[in-house]
Every structure is written in C-alpha cells, then in structure tokens.
C-alpha cells in the first residue's frame, strides 16, 4: 500500500552556483534555481484515477511544436503549452485547481527538500572513475595494467560473466536525487530559490523540487 504524504513540488532550471553571506557572516555556497511560473495542468483523484497527484507544467515551448492531443490537454487546462510536465504524488491534490499557478514561495527558507535532476554526462569511463576501483600496483611486476579492472569472473564454472559485474562504460546522464537540501533563501520578485550546496545536473538543466521524503526536521512526526 502506498503511503501518501503532503508533498509540494516545483520545476525549475539550474542556473549555477555562487556564494552568499548568512546572518552569522559566514560564506554559504548555494545553487541558484530559477523556478519561474509553474502551472497545474491536471489534478488526479482517487475517484477518477485511483490515487492523488497533480501534474505540473513548466517552461515555454512554441505551440507549433506540440501534438494535437497535447494542445487539447493544455487547452483544457486553460494554459499555454509547456515544455516539461511532471506528476507529483501528494495527499493535498484536492487543494489544487487546474490552471493554478505555483510560484517560488511554495517553499520557504529553512525548509528541507529533495532535488531531482539528470547528472552530467561523462562519456565512456573506466572502472576507476566510474566505480572507484583502486587499480593495480604502480610497480612490483605490474606491466601496463595499472588502471585495468582485473578479473571479471571464474573459469569453466560457471563459464560466463554474471550480470551486474561492474565494468567500464558510459558514465553519467542518470536521474539523481539529492535528499534533504536546505532552502537558504527565496526571491519571489526574481523567481529564484537558493539551495545550500550542490544539486545534480549541468547549468541550464531541469530540476524537480519536492518536499523532503526523509526530512530530519520532521523525523518522528506525521507528514
């Protein structure tokens, strides 16, 4: 059985990192997120869909680049086409209305959130970079195999390589979630959210901000 929580969510664009001063005159590294205006394009309820959720749209897109079903979906919501659509499961779905706009003040300073993004692509990487292998000795008989992975299996038994063996390959471009990121400040005038520390993804990448699922601020409390 799925436990429904009172989740809030926004979509935004990662602008990059900078540093600011806090109230104690300490430098705090922050990531700047431009959340802009999000719009609720659909509300799911147990009566119609079997669960509670909201669909949030973000980002501009030329209306000529959307399909007719998509155009009808946005027209039904009474909004212009949006580039990104994300569904957020929340027990508070009944509190939202289709066409409602969500701003950066959805979250407040000091709140903990989970940030989901697509990690930077690193291309084809070896096992030392991709999986943290130690490599082979630099000397003492090691000959041109300093960064090799070593053995990947046994001999005639089992006579194959097991699935899941860590090897070299494409690294990055994965969906990554950083949990319990603290909101340092919210600028409603500019539509910006400052998050303490780093978050996944490159500059200009799409990020999804959700209420923290395992927040230390609400541990032991009902959410």
Curated annotation (Swiss-Prot):
<comment type="subunit">
    <text>Part of the 50S ribosomal subunit. Forms a cluster with proteins L14 and L19.</text>
</comment>
<keyword id="KW-0699">rRNA-binding</keyword>
<dbReference type="InterPro" id="IPR000597">
    <property type="entry name" value="Ribosomal_uL3"/>
</dbReference>
<dbReference type="GO" id="GO:0003735">
    <property type="term" value="F:structural constituent of ribosome"/>
</dbReference>
<comment type="similarity">
    <text>Belongs to the universal ribosomal protein uL3 family.</text>
</comment>
<dbReference type="InterPro" id="IPR019926">
    <property type="entry name" value="Ribosomal_uL3_CS"/>
</dbReference>
<dbReference type="InterPro" id="IPR019927">
    <property type="entry name" value="Ribosomal_uL3_bac/org-type"/>
</dbReference>
<dbReference type="GO" id="GO:0022625">
    <property type="term" value="C:cytosolic large ribosomal subunit"/>
</dbReference>
<dbReference type="GO" id="GO:0019843">
    <property type="term" value="F:rRNA binding"/>
</dbReference>
<dbReference type="InterPro" id="IPR009000">
    <property type="entry name" value="Transl_B-barrel_sf"/>
</dbReference>
<dbReference type="Pfam" id="PF00297">
    <property type="entry name" value="Ribosomal_L3"/>
</dbReference>
<keyword id="KW-0694">RNA-binding</keyword>
<keyword id="KW-0687">Ribonucleoprotein</keyword>
<dbReference type="GO" id="GO:0006412">
    <property type="term" value="P:translation"/>
</dbReference>
<comment type="function">
    <text>One of the primary rRNA binding proteins, it binds directly near the 3'-end of the 23S rRNA, where it nucleates assembly of the 50S subunit.</text>
</comment>
<protein>
    <recommendedName>
        <fullName>Large ribosomal subunit protein uL3</fullName>
    </recommendedName>
</protein>
<keyword id="KW-0689">Ribosomal protein</keyword>
């Amino acid at each position: 059985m799925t436990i429904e929580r009172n989740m809030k969510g926004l979509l935004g664009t990662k602008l990059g990192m900078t540093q600011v001063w806090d109230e104690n005159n300490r430098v705090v590294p922050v990531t700047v997120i431009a959340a802009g205006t999000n719009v609720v394009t659909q509300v799911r309820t147990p009566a119609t869909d079997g669960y509670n959720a909201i669909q949030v749209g973000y980002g501009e897109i030329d209306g000529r680049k959307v399909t007719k079903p998509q155009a009808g979906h946005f027209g039904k919501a009474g909004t212009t086409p949006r580039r990104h659509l994300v569904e957020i499961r929340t027990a508070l779905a009944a509190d939202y209305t289709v066409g409602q706009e969500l701003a950066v003040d959805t979250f407040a300073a000091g709140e903990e959130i989970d940030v989901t993004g697509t990690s930077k692509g690193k291309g084809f990487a070896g096992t030392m970079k991709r999986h943290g292998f130690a490599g082979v000795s630099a000397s003492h008989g090691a000959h041109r195999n300093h960064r090799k992975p070593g053995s990947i299996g046994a001999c005639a038994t089992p006579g194959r390589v097991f699935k899941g063996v860590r090897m070299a390959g494409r690294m990055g471009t994965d969906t990554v979630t950083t949990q319990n990121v603290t909101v340092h400040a919210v600028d409603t005038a500019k539509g910006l959210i400052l998050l303490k520390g780093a978050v996944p993804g490159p500059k200009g990448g799409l990020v999804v901000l959700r209420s923290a699922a395992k927040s230390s601020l609400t541990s032991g409390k009902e959410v």
